[in-house]
Design a protein with these regions (language model features):
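Positively charged, small/polar-rich N-terminal and surface patches that mediate targeting and assembly
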Residues: 1-150
Length: 150
């Protein structure tokens, strides 16, 4: 079992930006559900919210083979946006679901990247990576075989 992350090479991100984007991609399968409030409860003391408790449910294989194992990750490079989106297409053809099995990571363009697209509020962003939840090795290989290691 391994986690696959594919990052764009054409953006020429600095090492720090690349690391940050890959970290976002690595954690998205955990942070996106929490950020949407799934399994989150407030912790109260004396009527005041002092924190939050988040429940994360992992399938048996993910826990036993990845969390309780080696946290194996493979980082590949995509030549450009179109090649990165090919990974999305391959994943969907394999039955994987966006925002559950894989996550498209977009930078908010506050530092070194220029926006490629804009959301409904006019906020600029650039697609940088695709991150997958931990996958069986054979599925990760089917997606990554079209890409080189970063």
């Amino acid at each position: 079992m391994r986690q696959l992350i594919i990052a764009r090479k054409d953006l020429q991100m600095s090492p720090g930006k690349l690391a940050a984007q890959c970290c976002h991609a690595s954690l998205a399968f955990l942070t996106d559900p929490i950020g949407m409030g799934q399994g989150v409860e407030p912790i109260e003391e004396d009527g005041e919210i002092t924190g939050y408790r988040a429940e994360i449910i992992l399938d048996k294989a993910t826990y036993e083979e990845w969390f309780d194992g080696s946290f194996t990750k493979t980082i590949c490079g995509a030549k450009n946006r179109n090649q990165l989106l090919k990974a999305k297409t391959i994943a969907e053809e394999l039955g994987l679901v966006e925002n559950n099995d894989f996550f498209l990571i977009r930078d908010a363009c506050h530092t070194e990247l220029e926006p490629e697209e804009f959301d409904e509020n006019g906020e600029g962003m650039t697609l940088t990576c695709i991150g997958f939840r931990p996958l069986p090795d054979e599925i990760a290989r089917q997606i990554s075989r079209k890409f080189h290691l970063y």
